[in-house]
Amino acid sequence: MADRARAARMAKRIQTIVANTIEHSVKDRRLELVTITDTQLTGDLHDATVFYTVRGRTLDEEPDREQAAEALHRARGQLRKAVGDQLGVRFTPTLTFTLDTVPETSARLEELLAQARQRDQEVARQAEGATPAGDANPYKTSPHEGRPESEADGW
């Protein structure tokens, strides 16, 4: 079991190596719009999970995630070799590529928060000129409340 700090440093280094290799060495056009977002390394330093996102060519175009996954799978050997050459460790970790769903989840949460804000504004508009039903102070009070303690006890 390796030190957690060492595993974190190695994971960050693997992320950098994989991203640079995809950008400069891998000759697959399907990987042009792939971004490496994170890497996690197991405690024994033998397996690395590389998280990635895929953008569309335009803002309106849906990204081709299946083609990117296939291209990463095909380039896995070249990427692992680059990691082994540049990392300088005895055992080069195996690379597993996983689509990062954080951007989609984040966008969905932003959408839900915007809907909640809109509903809150509607409630605030409806409550703007309203008066409370009943008394201004709806809580029951005892007849002794508000008087000094010596008078309240009857002494």
Curated annotation (Swiss-Prot):
- CC per GO annotation: cytosol
* Pfam families xrefs: RBFA (PF02033)
- Superkingdom field: Bacteria
Q: Which parts of the sequence are annotated with region: Disordered?
A: 116-155
Q: Does the keyword Cell inner membrane apply?
A: no
- A GO BP annotation: maturation of SSU-rRNA
Write out the annotated subcellular location: Cytoplasm
Relate the protein's function as given in its record: One of several proteins that assist in the late maturation steps of the functional core of the 30S ribosomal subunit. Associates with free 30S ribosomal subunits (but not with 30S subunits that are part of 70S ribosomes or polysomes). Required for efficient processing of 16S rRNA. May interact with the 5'-terminal helix region of 16S rRNA.
State the oligomer form and interacting partners.
Monomer. Binds 30S ribosomal subunits, but not 50S ribosomal subunits or 70S ribosomes.
- What is the name attached to this protein's record? Ribosome-binding factor A
Q: Which organism is it from?
A: Corynebacterium kroppenstedtii (strain DSM 44385 / JCM 11950 / CIP 105744 / CCUG 35717)
